[in-house]
Amino acid sequence: MNAITMRPIAESIFSEKALGRVLWTDITSHIDIPSSNRSHMDGFVVKHSDITRISQYGPIKLRIIPKRKANRKNQKLLTGRSTRISTGEVMPLLGDTVIPLEYTQFGSKNHTITIQRDFPKGSFISYKGSEIARNDLLLSAGHVLRTQDLALVSVLGIRKLKIFKKPTVAIIPTGNELTNEINVAKGGKILNTNSRVISDLIEISGGKPLDLGITPDNNDKIKNKIRVALSESDIILTTGGSSVGVRDLVAESINDIGKPGILVHGIKLDRGRVTGLAALRRKPVIVLPGPIQGAANAFIVFAQPLIRVMLGLNPFTEPLIIAKLTEDWNARKKFQNFTKIVYVKISQSVSGEFHAKPITGETTDITVLTKSNGFIMVPERLTRLKRRQKVKINIFPGLSFSSGSSIEFP
């Protein structure tokens, strides 16, 4: 991390566009809510001293005075008097208790009411500042805004919010074999699905994807794309062209542009071992493998934490589910001392217990991802997981569920 600088940036946006965004500053209330004492029920306002005799002498009668429509809060309630009030209406001066309608009875010509029972002083009144007081801290910096938070902001009359700006993440897919055309892919080319997957993962992680398009295996063209990415984005991801032990044009291009260049090329991650990590102009460059599982794994381990740092969030999310494995799982022999990512299909029994079935396949198999809805991070020291063993399952937005749906475990 010494080779890069992750400096979050603030921006102001209208509150109606802020769902899911991260607050840059605290929000404190500049008003009291309620702004004055208000009735919590439909009924009659009384002075409590007028109804204390009910418990001893039974129901009492009070004279009804008409309510003043304007400046209700300046209307005084005198002894022996009562006035009608509606839910949410401002309390008149000296009125200190509300009697619900169902405990009153109108007298002749509706000039008086009979109150059937006593209520504690202050009953059915929402006092000034009882929900929110002036200078209360309501939302803290770093909070991810939910719909109820934005409703609160609206109540406070706040039109604009200062939030963490979404980091722009550039995607540079490389390789002569790639195409975006399905018909061309049928003729021997490889359909560029990685860009779609990585772009969606960037967006759902809180970043702003910038797809710079397929780049052929040409050193100068790769360098030009990287230079564009350096000027227009905060984080750069390349996909494909990453290998260890053979000529790697992406790594060469990165090193040609400047120092420090490639910092790590090849990591102990299964799948994703040919991932490269680099730095240029204090910006992180992640060289993702071409095979889809390796690319997704490297994104989870390296790219998403960087996006979260730029958003002022904890870089690592916690596992959300504890589940029992439905079958044994064994690490591949030559990768036993690697960190392993095991994709699983989570289901839930009638009793509510979660179960996880390991999903295996080739590193290029997109179906490993489509059949799964969670994954296990298996540390280097573990080479085997046993049936019925309890494991921590990571739930990753975009891979486990879409942003517009709930998590479902059939």
Where are these regions (language model features)?
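Short, hydrophobic/aliphatic alpha-helical segments
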Residues: 18-32, 71-84, 277-278
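Helix-rich terminal scaffold detector
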Residues: 159-288, 292-301, 409-410
